[in-house]
Amino acid sequence: MTLSDAVAHLSPHRWARANRLLIRKALAEFTHERLLSPEADGEGRYTVRSDDGLTRYTFTAVIRALDHWQVDAESITRHRDGAEVPLSALDFFIELQKSLGLSDEILPVYLEEISSTLSGTCYKLTKPAVPAAELARADFQTVETSMTEGHPCFVANNGRLGFGIHEYLSYAPETANPVRLVWLAAHRSRAAFTAGAGVEYESFLREELGGETVERFHAVLREQDLDPADYLLIPVHPWQWWNKLSVTFAAEVARRNLVCLGEGDDEYLAQQSIRTFFNRTSPTKHYVKTALSVINMGFMRGLSAAYMEATPAINDWLAQLIENDPVLRSTGLSIIRERAAVGYRHLEYEQATDRYSPYRKMLAALWRESPVPSLREGESLATMASLVHVDDQGASVAGALIRQSGLTPVEWLRRYLQAYFTPLLHSFYAYDLVYMPHGENVILVLKDGVVQRAIYKDIAEEIAVMDADAVLPPAVERVRVDVPEDTKLLSIFTDVFDCFFRFLAANLATEGILAEDDFWRTVAEVTRAYQKSMPSLADRFRQYDMFAPEFALSCLNRLQLRNNRQMVDLADPSGALQLIGTLKNPIAGF
């Protein structure tokens, strides 16, 4: 690849298109979060003015449930000094810096994230457009690598600060380029391997790597007069080796606490979360999740060595809870367990930092089960994020699945809700247990376009038990969190209603497939059906009212605009919430 080839996707027409799409999203989501207050000009047309009042953006929009602004990208125009001027996302954030609450310190870093997001969109625009109907029938990894929007709420959602253009082209999930992981030997005095029930280190590594590869790696150690029995093997993202470990952990390499063994044989595909890899060579083998010290959507994407120690136990506990609960079992819910984990402690950095520091999250990995072996005849897999994916003609994958299924839109939706939403309700009301159930964290099992069951993932880092009195095994105690009573239900209202159903309902309504009222009526009916089936939890249903008239608006972009390097204090995540006013509960009237 030549120097100019690396930026061939950055053409004027693609850049203009990417800017228009991003400004559309910014107008919609920042208005939703009440950072912007568009002036109505009549007939669905609105104006937003810059901080100095000299620039104005005009556009048409439909306002839907949950104060969702569906902005028409083609309608957006920008005017200054009486003349129309080209759209520029970077200018947009500078012109509205004060309105958006961007400090002088954060602004340039945020602009860098916006530039990276725009560049990523330009790359995606070079790929042939895949119709939603085709994606609805595509294989698991084709769907995964075809996602174009990223998180539906966050505007700067593809920052990946730390990736150069060559690394973007090598490792970004949308490029779908196969990756071989780097393997290190880590001295047992600094490293720890933990695993779930029935998993033993030596046999597990041989199953994942193959006996020949393990022997090859051991030979590298023996050639340096090192004993393989003194070391644990750790998979590493290639970027992390080249950019961090080879420099930041130089002392560990020099002391032979870390030894680079080379690349593994299997080829992997990066998933939407960037640092997790699917085994393309052997799809039934485990995913590998690695530490990656790039900034993306408000966090450095490292992995804590300390957190890894309890990860398998937490997954085993949740899997057992699901297995023992007849309601969860009846929905078909499962998790793909994080079966094993390994972490490396750099003693000097630990002395110099607190437990939340990125320096403690540079070298760790976990192995997560593949969902492929669980498939039955005729079933396929798709990231739930695909439901809100819209192709270049405005057609959604959810709409395509409904057409493929032959079911009425309401019946299709009901089956999806019973598979995905009912388990969330029951986990909350029966166990005070919550997940992070956004589109990228859920895999749907489909058959003939119909959702059969849901698979939740990213368990140990994301689940929480909000009951101070719940009896938990010592190894699982970490998931207990203290959350104010009045914000507990935001785990449903924000994470599910506002951050996912809001977009799904709007897309189906826009396509003329399912009216918004019918969408939310169905959500209400599924909720009431669950509650009716569980009379023993009636007091809980009253205490935490799913049919309350309104709920607090929790703003995600405000977190990132305030601090895009670490948008949540990990010591007090609920305390970081940006609650701005309320939203009308769309199921309250049903």
Q: Language-model features: where?
A:
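Nucleotide/phosphate-binding site architecture used for ATP/NTP-dependent chemistry
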Residues: M1-A419, L446-F590
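Protein kinase catalytic-loop region centered on the HRD/HxD motif
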Residues: H426-Y431
